[in-house]
A protein has these predicted regions:
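Secondary-structure end/capping motifs
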Residues: 286-371
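Conserved C-terminal helix/tail region of periplasmic/extracytoplasmic solute-binding proteins
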Residues: 48, 56, 359-395
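N-terminal Sec-pathway targeting helices
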Residues: 1-17
Length: 395
Protein backbone atom coordinates (compact mmCIF):
# COMPACT_ATOMS: atom_id res chain seq x y z
CA UNK A 1 0.00 0.00 0.00
CA UNK A 2 1.58 3.31 -1.12
CA UNK A 3 2.02 6.16 1.35
CA UNK A 4 0.20 9.36 0.49
CA UNK A 5 1.01 12.84 1.77
CA UNK A 6 -1.74 14.16 3.99
CA UNK A 7 -2.90 17.76 4.16
CA UNK A 8 -0.93 18.40 7.40
CA UNK A 9 2.54 17.98 5.90
CA UNK A 10 2.90 21.54 4.60
CA UNK A 11 1.80 23.24 7.85
CA UNK A 12 4.24 21.01 9.72
CA UNK A 13 7.10 22.01 7.42
CA UNK A 14 6.11 25.67 7.82
CA UNK A 15 6.25 25.39 11.61
CA UNK A 16 9.68 23.80 11.39
CA UNK A 17 10.95 26.63 9.20
CA UNK A 18 9.49 29.25 11.58
CA UNK A 19 11.05 27.54 14.58
CA UNK A 20 14.45 27.38 12.94
CA UNK A 21 14.15 31.03 11.94
CA UNK A 22 13.24 32.04 15.49
CA UNK A 23 16.25 30.22 16.95
CA UNK A 24 18.59 31.75 14.37
CA UNK A 25 17.22 35.26 14.93
CA UNK A 26 17.55 34.84 18.69
CA UNK A 27 21.17 33.68 18.42
CA UNK A 28 22.10 36.57 16.12
CA UNK A 29 20.42 39.15 18.36
CA UNK A 30 17.77 40.25 15.89
CA UNK A 31 14.93 39.65 18.36
CA UNK A 32 16.52 41.91 20.98
CA UNK A 33 16.93 44.67 18.39
CA UNK A 34 13.31 44.41 17.30
CA UNK A 35 12.13 44.48 20.92
CA UNK A 36 14.26 47.53 21.71
CA UNK A 37 12.92 49.34 18.62
CA UNK A 38 9.22 48.55 18.76
CA UNK A 39 8.69 47.65 22.46
CA UNK A 40 11.26 49.66 24.49
CA UNK A 41 9.09 49.59 27.65
CA UNK A 42 9.24 45.80 27.73
CA UNK A 43 13.01 45.81 28.24
CA UNK A 44 13.80 45.18 31.89
CA UNK A 45 15.27 48.15 33.77
CA UNK A 46 18.33 47.13 35.78
CA UNK A 47 19.12 49.18 38.89
CA UNK A 48 22.78 49.34 39.83
CA UNK A 49 23.83 49.88 43.44
CA UNK A 50 27.07 50.00 45.46
CA UNK A 51 26.33 46.48 46.68
CA UNK A 52 27.02 45.16 43.16
CA UNK A 53 30.73 45.86 43.65
CA UNK A 54 33.34 45.02 46.32
CA UNK A 55 33.20 47.42 49.26
CA UNK A 56 36.87 48.39 49.01
CA UNK A 57 37.07 49.46 45.36
CA UNK A 58 37.34 53.14 46.32
CA UNK A 59 40.09 52.65 48.92
CA UNK A 60 43.33 54.58 48.25
CA UNK A 61 45.91 52.93 46.00
CA UNK A 62 48.84 54.14 48.09
CA UNK A 63 49.32 53.47 51.79
CA UNK A 64 46.01 53.30 53.59
CA UNK A 65 45.31 56.01 56.15
CA UNK A 66 45.57 54.76 59.71
CA UNK A 67 42.38 56.42 60.91
CA UNK A 68 39.91 58.87 59.39
CA UNK A 69 40.51 62.59 59.94
CA UNK A 70 36.93 62.94 61.17
CA UNK A 71 35.47 61.18 64.24
CA UNK A 72 34.53 57.54 63.79
CA UNK A 73 30.86 57.14 64.68
CA UNK A 74 29.80 53.91 66.42
CA UNK A 75 26.05 53.44 66.83
CA UNK A 76 24.42 51.41 69.59
CA UNK A 77 21.22 50.88 71.52
CA UNK A 78 21.71 50.93 75.28
CA UNK A 79 22.38 47.66 77.08
CA UNK A 80 24.86 46.46 79.68
CA UNK A 81 27.64 45.56 77.26
CA UNK A 82 27.54 49.13 75.90
CA UNK A 83 29.34 50.18 79.09
CA UNK A 84 32.66 49.25 77.48
CA UNK A 85 31.88 51.40 74.44
CA UNK A 86 30.94 54.35 76.64
CA UNK A 87 34.14 54.02 78.67
CA UNK A 88 36.21 53.76 75.49
CA UNK A 89 34.67 56.90 73.97
CA UNK A 90 34.12 58.92 77.14
CA UNK A 91 30.33 59.04 76.85
CA UNK A 92 27.57 59.16 74.27
CA UNK A 93 26.25 61.66 71.76
CA UNK A 94 23.42 61.52 69.23
CA UNK A 95 23.04 62.26 65.53
CA UNK A 96 20.79 65.19 66.43
CA UNK A 97 23.49 66.57 68.73
CA UNK A 98 26.85 65.28 67.42
CA UNK A 99 28.94 67.38 69.81
CA UNK A 100 31.61 65.33 71.58
CA UNK A 101 30.61 64.33 75.14
CA UNK A 102 32.26 66.07 78.06
CA UNK A 103 34.48 63.08 78.81
CA UNK A 104 35.59 62.40 75.23
CA UNK A 105 39.17 63.50 75.93
CA UNK A 106 39.42 60.89 78.71
CA UNK A 107 38.09 58.01 76.62
CA UNK A 108 40.42 55.04 76.25
CA UNK A 109 40.39 55.25 72.46
CA UNK A 110 41.65 58.83 72.65
CA UNK A 111 44.18 58.47 75.45
CA UNK A 112 45.60 55.03 74.58
CA UNK A 113 45.12 54.78 70.82
CA UNK A 114 45.01 58.39 69.58
CA UNK A 115 41.69 57.82 67.89
CA UNK A 116 38.72 60.16 67.82
CA UNK A 117 35.63 57.96 68.14
CA UNK A 118 32.12 58.72 69.35
CA UNK A 119 29.42 56.43 70.65
CA UNK A 120 26.08 57.42 69.13
CA UNK A 121 23.01 56.22 71.03
CA UNK A 122 19.76 55.33 69.26
CA UNK A 123 16.31 54.91 70.75
CA UNK A 124 15.31 52.04 68.45
CA UNK A 125 17.07 49.31 66.52
CA UNK A 126 15.34 50.41 63.32
CA UNK A 127 16.87 53.89 63.58
CA UNK A 128 20.27 52.26 64.08
CA UNK A 129 19.75 50.08 60.99
CA UNK A 130 18.98 53.12 58.85
CA UNK A 131 22.06 54.96 60.14
CA UNK A 132 24.30 52.00 59.34
CA UNK A 133 22.75 51.73 55.88
CA UNK A 134 23.59 55.31 54.86
CA UNK A 135 26.99 55.59 56.57
CA UNK A 136 28.66 58.43 58.47
CA UNK A 137 29.44 60.33 55.27
CA UNK A 138 25.69 60.78 54.75
CA UNK A 139 24.47 61.40 58.28
CA UNK A 140 24.72 57.86 59.65
CA UNK A 141 27.39 55.78 61.39
CA UNK A 142 30.53 53.85 60.43
CA UNK A 143 30.04 50.94 62.82
CA UNK A 144 27.23 49.57 64.94
CA UNK A 145 26.75 47.25 67.90
CA UNK A 146 23.80 45.01 67.00
CA UNK A 147 22.64 41.52 67.93
CA UNK A 148 23.44 38.65 65.59
CA UNK A 149 19.77 37.91 65.00
CA UNK A 150 19.22 41.54 63.93
CA UNK A 151 22.09 41.26 61.44
CA UNK A 152 20.52 38.11 60.00
CA UNK A 153 17.17 39.86 59.63
CA UNK A 154 18.58 43.10 58.22
CA UNK A 155 21.32 41.88 55.91
CA UNK A 156 19.29 42.02 52.66
CA UNK A 157 18.39 45.67 53.36
CA UNK A 158 22.04 46.43 54.27
CA UNK A 159 23.48 44.97 51.06
CA UNK A 160 24.89 48.29 49.85
CA UNK A 161 26.57 48.88 53.23
CA UNK A 162 28.25 45.44 53.03
CA UNK A 163 28.49 45.17 56.85
CA UNK A 164 31.11 42.85 58.29
CA UNK A 165 31.16 41.50 61.83
CA UNK A 166 34.52 42.25 63.46
CA UNK A 167 34.12 41.30 67.15
CA UNK A 168 31.81 40.11 69.92
CA UNK A 169 30.71 42.95 72.20
CA UNK A 170 28.74 40.93 74.76
CA UNK A 171 25.96 38.43 75.46
CA UNK A 172 22.63 38.89 77.21
CA UNK A 173 22.49 36.87 80.42
CA UNK A 174 19.21 38.16 81.74
CA UNK A 175 18.87 41.57 80.07
CA UNK A 176 15.95 40.46 77.87
CA UNK A 177 12.89 39.33 79.81
CA UNK A 178 9.30 38.26 79.22
CA UNK A 179 6.89 39.45 81.89
CA UNK A 180 3.14 38.95 82.20
CA UNK A 181 0.11 39.83 84.29
CA UNK A 182 -2.45 37.13 85.00
CA UNK A 183 -0.34 34.47 83.28
CA UNK A 184 1.10 31.94 85.76
CA UNK A 185 3.47 30.13 83.38
CA UNK A 186 4.70 30.06 79.79
CA UNK A 187 2.19 27.44 78.67
CA UNK A 188 -0.60 29.79 79.76
CA UNK A 189 0.46 32.30 77.10
CA UNK A 190 -1.82 30.46 74.68
CA UNK A 191 -4.57 32.82 73.55
CA UNK A 192 -2.95 35.83 75.27
CA UNK A 193 -1.78 39.13 73.80
CA UNK A 194 2.02 39.25 73.53
CA UNK A 195 3.54 42.70 73.04
CA UNK A 196 6.98 43.01 71.47
CA UNK A 197 8.99 45.35 69.27
CA UNK A 198 9.46 43.30 66.06
CA UNK A 199 12.75 44.95 65.07
CA UNK A 200 14.56 44.24 68.33
CA UNK A 201 16.40 41.33 69.92
CA UNK A 202 13.44 40.87 72.28
CA UNK A 203 11.42 39.56 69.35
CA UNK A 204 13.99 36.82 68.72
CA UNK A 205 13.94 36.01 72.43
CA UNK A 206 10.12 35.81 72.45
CA UNK A 207 10.23 33.31 69.58
CA UNK A 208 12.58 31.14 71.63
CA UNK A 209 10.25 31.40 74.63
CA UNK A 210 7.29 30.20 72.55
CA UNK A 211 9.30 27.26 71.24
CA UNK A 212 10.33 26.37 74.78
CA UNK A 213 6.67 26.38 75.87
CA UNK A 214 5.64 24.24 72.90
CA UNK A 215 3.52 27.03 71.42
CA UNK A 216 3.10 28.10 67.82
CA UNK A 217 3.27 31.71 66.67
CA UNK A 218 -0.47 31.57 65.98
CA UNK A 219 -1.18 30.52 69.58
CA UNK A 220 -0.69 34.12 70.76
CA UNK A 221 -2.06 37.43 69.52
CA UNK A 222 0.92 39.58 68.58
CA UNK A 223 0.86 43.24 69.60
CA UNK A 224 3.54 45.19 67.71
CA UNK A 225 5.16 47.88 69.84
CA UNK A 226 6.85 51.02 68.45
CA UNK A 227 10.05 50.31 70.39
CA UNK A 228 11.51 47.99 72.99
CA UNK A 229 11.17 50.79 75.54
CA UNK A 230 7.38 50.74 75.10
CA UNK A 231 7.07 47.21 76.52
CA UNK A 232 6.66 48.22 80.17
CA UNK A 233 4.16 50.93 79.31
CA UNK A 234 2.11 48.50 77.21
CA UNK A 235 1.89 46.10 80.16
CA UNK A 236 0.92 48.86 82.59
CA UNK A 237 -1.78 50.20 80.26
CA UNK A 238 -3.23 46.75 79.64
CA UNK A 239 -2.50 46.79 75.91
CA UNK A 240 -0.89 43.38 76.28
CA UNK A 241 -1.13 40.46 78.69
CA UNK A 242 2.58 39.74 78.34
CA UNK A 243 5.50 41.68 76.91
CA UNK A 244 9.10 40.99 75.95
CA UNK A 245 11.64 43.73 76.55
CA UNK A 246 14.43 44.89 78.84
CA UNK A 247 14.46 43.51 82.40
CA UNK A 248 14.65 46.88 84.11
CA UNK A 249 11.57 48.06 82.24
CA UNK A 250 9.24 45.04 82.16
CA UNK A 251 10.02 43.65 85.62
CA UNK A 252 8.97 46.87 87.31
CA UNK A 253 5.83 47.14 85.17
CA UNK A 254 4.82 43.56 85.99
CA UNK A 255 5.44 44.08 89.70
CA UNK A 256 3.31 47.23 89.71
CA UNK A 257 0.35 45.20 88.39
CA UNK A 258 0.90 42.08 90.44
CA UNK A 259 2.49 40.14 87.60
CA UNK A 260 5.82 38.39 87.28
CA UNK A 261 8.75 37.71 84.98
CA UNK A 262 8.29 34.31 83.32
CA UNK A 263 11.59 33.98 81.44
CA UNK A 264 14.85 35.84 80.78
CA UNK A 265 17.92 35.32 78.66
CA UNK A 266 19.57 33.93 81.78
CA UNK A 267 17.70 30.78 80.69
CA UNK A 268 19.43 31.01 77.28
CA UNK A 269 22.71 32.91 77.84
CA UNK A 270 24.02 32.18 74.34
CA UNK A 271 20.90 33.27 72.43
CA UNK A 272 21.28 37.06 72.17
CA UNK A 273 24.84 38.05 71.28
CA UNK A 274 25.78 41.63 70.42
CA UNK A 275 28.51 42.05 67.81
CA UNK A 276 30.30 45.04 66.36
CA UNK A 277 29.79 45.39 62.61
CA UNK A 278 31.63 47.81 60.35
CA UNK A 279 30.49 49.13 57.00
CA UNK A 280 32.49 47.45 54.25
CA UNK A 281 33.81 50.71 52.80
CA UNK A 282 35.01 51.92 56.21
CA UNK A 283 36.74 48.63 57.07
CA UNK A 284 38.48 48.54 53.69
CA UNK A 285 39.64 52.16 53.84
CA UNK A 286 40.69 52.27 57.52
CA UNK A 287 41.81 48.77 58.59
CA UNK A 288 44.01 50.13 61.37
CA UNK A 289 41.06 52.07 62.80
CA UNK A 290 39.15 48.80 63.14
CA UNK A 291 42.09 47.28 65.02
CA UNK A 292 42.26 50.27 67.36
CA UNK A 293 38.54 50.09 68.09
CA UNK A 294 38.83 46.39 68.93
CA UNK A 295 41.79 47.04 71.24
CA UNK A 296 40.00 49.92 72.91
CA UNK A 297 36.80 47.97 73.51
CA UNK A 298 38.68 44.98 74.92
CA UNK A 299 40.68 47.23 77.26
CA UNK A 300 37.52 49.06 78.32
CA UNK A 301 35.73 45.77 78.90
CA UNK A 302 38.54 44.59 81.16
CA UNK A 303 38.30 47.85 83.12
CA UNK A 304 34.53 47.43 83.50
CA UNK A 305 34.97 43.93 84.89
CA UNK A 306 37.64 45.12 87.32
CA UNK A 307 35.83 48.28 88.47
CA UNK A 308 32.33 48.81 87.01
CA UNK A 309 31.71 52.12 88.80
CA UNK A 310 32.84 54.67 86.15
CA UNK A 311 31.21 52.78 83.28
CA UNK A 312 28.02 52.25 85.30
CA UNK A 313 27.80 56.00 85.87
CA UNK A 314 28.04 56.67 82.12
CA UNK A 315 25.50 53.95 81.36
CA UNK A 316 23.08 55.28 83.96
CA UNK A 317 23.24 58.75 82.41
CA UNK A 318 22.54 57.41 78.92
CA UNK A 319 19.94 54.75 79.75
CA UNK A 320 18.13 55.19 83.07
CA UNK A 321 15.43 52.84 81.78
CA UNK A 322 17.84 49.92 82.23
CA UNK A 323 17.39 50.25 85.97
CA UNK A 324 20.41 49.81 88.22
CA UNK A 325 23.33 50.24 85.76
CA UNK A 326 25.59 47.92 87.73
CA UNK A 327 22.94 45.20 87.51
CA UNK A 328 22.48 45.96 83.81
CA UNK A 329 26.20 45.38 83.25
CA UNK A 330 26.03 42.14 85.21
CA UNK A 331 23.16 40.87 83.04
CA UNK A 332 24.97 41.75 79.80
CA UNK A 333 28.70 42.02 80.54
CA UNK A 334 31.28 43.14 77.96
CA UNK A 335 32.96 40.25 76.15
CA UNK A 336 36.60 39.37 76.80
CA UNK A 337 39.26 38.39 74.28
CA UNK A 338 38.79 34.74 75.32
CA UNK A 339 35.05 35.09 74.65
CA UNK A 340 35.81 36.45 71.18
CA UNK A 341 38.28 33.70 70.36
CA UNK A 342 35.80 30.98 71.30
CA UNK A 343 32.77 32.66 69.71
CA UNK A 344 34.48 32.96 66.33
CA UNK A 345 36.26 29.62 66.49
CA UNK A 346 39.79 31.02 66.77
CA UNK A 347 40.59 29.00 69.91
CA UNK A 348 38.76 27.36 72.76
CA UNK A 349 35.17 26.18 72.63
CA UNK A 350 31.82 27.94 72.78
CA UNK A 351 28.39 26.29 73.20
CA UNK A 352 27.15 28.42 70.29
CA UNK A 353 29.48 30.01 67.73
CA UNK A 354 28.86 33.06 65.59
CA UNK A 355 28.29 30.97 62.47
CA UNK A 356 25.76 28.73 64.23
CA UNK A 357 23.86 31.65 65.71
CA UNK A 358 23.75 33.61 62.45
CA UNK A 359 22.70 30.65 60.32
CA UNK A 360 19.96 29.54 62.71
CA UNK A 361 18.56 33.07 63.04
CA UNK A 362 18.67 33.53 59.28
CA UNK A 363 16.87 30.22 58.69
CA UNK A 364 14.24 31.09 61.30
CA UNK A 365 13.49 34.51 59.83
CA UNK A 366 13.21 33.01 56.37
CA UNK A 367 10.89 30.35 57.76
CA UNK A 368 8.54 32.96 59.21
CA UNK A 369 9.04 35.21 56.16
CA UNK A 370 10.73 38.03 58.00
CA UNK A 371 13.73 38.27 55.68
CA UNK A 372 14.99 37.23 52.26
CA UNK A 373 17.74 34.71 51.60
CA UNK A 374 21.00 35.79 53.23
CA UNK A 375 24.60 34.80 52.44
CA UNK A 376 26.38 32.16 54.53
CA UNK A 377 27.77 33.25 57.89
CA UNK A 378 31.41 33.18 56.75
CA UNK A 379 30.61 35.88 54.18
CA UNK A 380 29.29 38.22 56.90
CA UNK A 381 32.39 38.38 59.09
CA UNK A 382 35.89 39.79 58.69
CA UNK A 383 38.12 38.50 61.46
CA UNK A 384 41.43 39.87 60.15
CA UNK A 385 41.60 42.68 62.70
CA UNK A 386 40.52 40.45 65.59
CA UNK A 387 43.11 37.82 64.66
CA UNK A 388 45.79 40.51 64.52
CA UNK A 389 44.90 41.77 67.99
CA UNK A 390 44.57 38.23 69.34
CA UNK A 391 48.01 37.19 68.09
CA UNK A 392 49.59 40.39 69.38
CA UNK A 393 48.22 39.80 72.88
CA UNK A 394 49.20 36.16 73.02
CA UNK A 395 47.44 33.30 74.82
Amino acid sequence: MALRRGPGLYPFLALCVLGAGYLLASRLGYLDRLQARFFPAAKQAVRLSPGDFPAGVAAPVADLASVPLRPTLIGFTARGSAAALLLATGGASSLDNPVAPAGAAQGLLKTAYAMDARAVVFATDEELRKALAVGAEHGGVDMAAISVDRLAAWLPSLRDAAPRTVMLVGRSRGQEALAAVGVPDLASLRGKRLGVYPSGASYYFSLWVLSRAGLRMTDVSWVELPSTLDAGRALREGRADAVAGLWGDVELAARDRGGAVLATTADAPHLVATVLVARGDYAARYPDAVRRVIRGLLDAGASVQKEPGPAARLLGEVAPYLGDPTEAIRSAPPATLADNRAFFGLSGEAPVTYDELFQSASALYQKIRRTAVTPPAEDTRDLGALKYVSEARGP
